[in-house]
Amino acid sequence: MFSKRIKLLKAYKTETTPCHIKLSSNENPFDLEESVKLELLEVIKNIEFNRYPDPHATKLRQTLSKLYEVEPENIMVCNGSDEAIQYLMLGIGELDEGVLIPRPTFPMYEVIANALGKPIYDVDLDENFQMNKQTLQKALEKKPSIAFISNPNNPTGNLFRDEDIALIRKHTFTVVDEAYYDFCGKTYIKDAIKDDNMAVMRTLSKIGLASLRVGALIGTKEFIREISKLKMPFNVSYTSQAMADYIISNHIDNIKNQIKVLIDERHRLKEALSDIKGIKVYDSCANFFLIKVNDADFIHKSLIQKGILTRNISYLPNLENHIRISIGKKEENDALINALKEIAQQVYL
């Protein structure tokens, strides 16, 4: 019944172990205030639940256009970035043409490419998690139809060199995934709205609205018109559109303040983790850290026993014994620091 292609696929897995402190999914640890949730109840009262949502997300596009400083016609609203990735792979080039992907990176690029049967052209990363120029050149020589660049890269946390992204743009359609833009400030949006050969993806998930599943694909107006032909009708729910629009319109300053707190915690947490024996902490431009330890399975399980959930990413290429840790609230980060110190004492006595 299923195709050979589907039989070979591996499902994307997330960490679901229940823990008191969740530092595994790169979420904003701050929930909406109760007063804001009460305001959203009023928003819900105005929703006609018997009607389909606006297929063009008109009002939300207008709100996002102000946030991203582009025109509404430069935006397609998606049900999370994953939907945008699928449309891009379907719409750019032919299905038998390859996808350029740095490795390791966000796994969904590979998952969706494999689901569609598209060849994958890997670009190895060096010890600083920058693209290896030799393997990059080899990948480009295979003439991929599209490239996906997570910038900052998930799970390594670093920004890629501008010169490498510029080289990729010269050879193929380039998608810059800026899911973590708010934590670094580096963007290619101004290029994307002028260049028909590139696009930018954004999401509301990492800034505190993960439950709404709202993403945005940004490009030239002509590009958005064409790629929108692939979009499923009513792809973003009425409730997600209405709530995202209300929160961004009325409470974006609160979200920006939370981001500032997380960036401050990023500096503090980096110093604290670096002082713990047996842990190598990599620099990060995102809301998470990548650490290297001697035994990731042991550390990961030990943290779970202490009620702290992190992400063991040892299954990714070249990341054996690496763990990704989301930046939490101060008290959560303190609990993490203390737990790792206790584990380190047990291991290195």
Swiss-Prot record:
Cofactor: pyridoxal 5'-phosphate
BP terms from Gene Ontology: L-histidine biosynthetic process
Transmembrane segments: none
Pathway(s) this gene product operates in, as recorded in its UniProt entry: Amino-acid biosynthesis; L-histidine biosynthesis; L-histidine from 5-phospho-alpha-D-ribose 1-diphosphate: step 7/9
Catalytic activity: L-histidinol phosphate + 2-oxoglutarate = 3-(imidazol-4-yl)-2-oxopropyl phosphate + L-glutamate
EC number: 2.6.1.9
Leading EC class: transferase
Gene Ontology MF terms: histidinol-phosphate transaminase activity; pyridoxal phosphate binding
Modified residues (N6-(pyridoxal phosphate)lysine): K206
Keyword Cell membrane part of the UniProt annotation: no
Alphabetic keyword roster: Amino-acid biosynthesis, Aminotransferase, Histidine biosynthesis, Pyridoxal phosphate, Transferase
Xref: NCBIfam families: hisC
Subunit structure: Homodimer.
PANTHER family: HISTIDINOL-PHOSPHATE AMINOTRANSFERASE (PTHR42885:SF2), HISTIDINOL-PHOSPHATE AMINOTRANSFERASE-RELATED (PTHR42885)
Family indicated by similarity: Belongs to the class-II pyridoxal-phosphate-dependent aminotransferase family. Histidinol-phosphate aminotransferase subfamily.
Protein name: Histidinol-phosphate aminotransferase
Organism, scientific name: Hydrogenobaculum sp. (strain Y04AAS1)
Lineage: Bacteria, Pseudomonadati, Aquificota, Aquificia, Aquificales
